[in-house]
């Protein structure tokens, strides 16, 4: 018999997370490491678990995540986005709750491109009057 699993893709900045939900006891594994070991910060661990806590499904699923690109904050955000999408696939009744919390919305903020004549996106070279 095939195992029941749900899938969601999450994106944030340059990070892309592929999230798989499998019935289990609530383990969260990111790139074959425990979530706290991978991200190294309690705040990012909390960000990842937000959709589970909001929907009271913490002990119902094991979460398996493959995430690439970006930095730790972007990866945590991408994981949260993918997890929310996977939860909606598992139970469509959770959609309004997750939508209201903003977990199903792709955060459109991206790094601004560097412009020629400037050092960074907006940082101009030092100006000297004399």
Curated annotation (Swiss-Prot):
One of its GO terms (cellular component) is cytosolic small ribosomal subunit. GO terms for biological process: translation. InterPro entries: Ribosomal_Su5_D2-typ_SF (IPR020568), Ribosomal_uS9 (IPR000754), Ribosomal_uS9_bac/plastid (IPR023035), Ribosomal_uS9_CS (IPR020574), Ribsml_uS5_D2-typ_fold_subgr (IPR014721). Residues 111-130 have a biased composition (Basic residues). GO terms for molecular function: RNA binding; structural constituent of ribosome. Disulfide bonds: none annotated. Residues 108-130 are annotated as: Disordered. Transmembrane segments: none annotated. Keywords: Ribonucleoprotein, Ribosomal protein. Pfam families: Ribosomal_S9 (PF00380). Belongs to the universal ribosomal protein uS9 family. HAMAP family: Ribosomal_uS9_B. NCBIfam families: PRK00132.1. This is Small ribosomal subunit protein uS9. It comes from Desulforamulus reducens (strain ATCC BAA-1160 / DSM 100696 / MI-1) (Desulfotomaculum reducens). The lineage of its organism: Bacteria, Bacillati, Bacillota, Clostridia, Eubacteriales. The gene is rpsI.
